[in-house]
Amino acid sequence: MFRRLIGVVVATVLLTFQLIVGSATALELDEATRTVPLNAQGDTVTLSLKQVKEGKRLFQYACAQCHVGGVTKTNQNVGLEPEALALATPNRNNIEGLVDYMKNPTTYDGVEEISEIHPSIKSADIFTAMRNLTDKDLESIAGHILLQPKILGDKWGGGKIYY
């Protein structure tokens, strides 16, 4: 009887603590954090809280099976960290560049099209997770990818040493 009472008290304290403290959500991201590059010309855009939330959900749905934590499972040398995106040709460190890649992916040097081996809108018949994604969805996913280094720092794309 006493053990049950202790268990109930501990559970109540933990649940109360969780309600008081809460968890990090999109609501806690300030406008400066949510501002990401829009294009190669240097324009920026501030993501709405809805875009942040939707981008995370869509990334988990369509991309995370291969890019969990910003790492590329099939090629550990190329991830989604800002440096790798900036060095790609054309560079992919902005929303327009990432959306273009999700529509028509190319090799890191930009020479060959790889839509048959990388999920994209172009290959939605093969990679069904991409089938119903709209341009707004792709922009939300791109925003999520560009936002993660600001939230996670070096963990995003850092690989096994962080996870």
Curated annotation (Swiss-Prot):
Membrane topology: Peripheral membrane protein
Cystine connections: none
GO molecular function, one term: iron ion binding
Cofactor note: Binds 1 heme c group covalently per subunit.
Residues holding heme c: 63, 66-67, 118
Signal peptide: 1-26
PROSITE patterns from the UniProt entry: CYTC
Keyword line: Electron transport, Heme, Iron, Membrane, Metal-binding, Photosynthesis, Photosystem II, Signal, Thylakoid, Transport
InterPro entries in alphabetical order: Cyt_c-like_dom, Cyt_c-like_dom_sf, Cytochrom_C550, PsbV_cyt_c550, PsbV_cyt_c550-like
GO biological processes: photosynthesis, light reaction; respiratory electron transport chain
A cellular-component GO term for this protein: plasma membrane-derived thylakoid membrane
Chief localization: membrane
Function: One of the extrinsic, lumenal subunits of photosystem II (PSII). PSII is a light-driven water plastoquinone oxidoreductase, using light energy to abstract electrons from H(2)O, generating a proton gradient subsequently used for ATP formation. The extrinsic proteins stabilize the structure of photosystem II oxygen-evolving complex (OEC), the ion environment of oxygen evolution and protect the OEC against heat-induced inactivation. Low-potential cytochrome c that plays a role in the OEC of PSII.
SUBUNIT field: PSII is composed of 1 copy each of membrane proteins PsbA, PsbB, PsbC, PsbD, PsbE, PsbF, PsbH, PsbI, PsbJ, PsbK, PsbL, PsbM, PsbT, PsbX, PsbY, PsbZ, Psb30/Ycf12, peripheral proteins PsbO, CyanoQ (PsbQ), PsbU, PsbV and a large number of cofactors. It forms dimeric complexes.
Family as reported in the entry's similarity comment: Belongs to the cytochrome c family. PsbV subfamily.
Record protein name field: Photosystem II extrinsic protein V
Organism field: Trichormus variabilis (strain ATCC 29413 / PCC 7937)
Gene coding for it: psbV
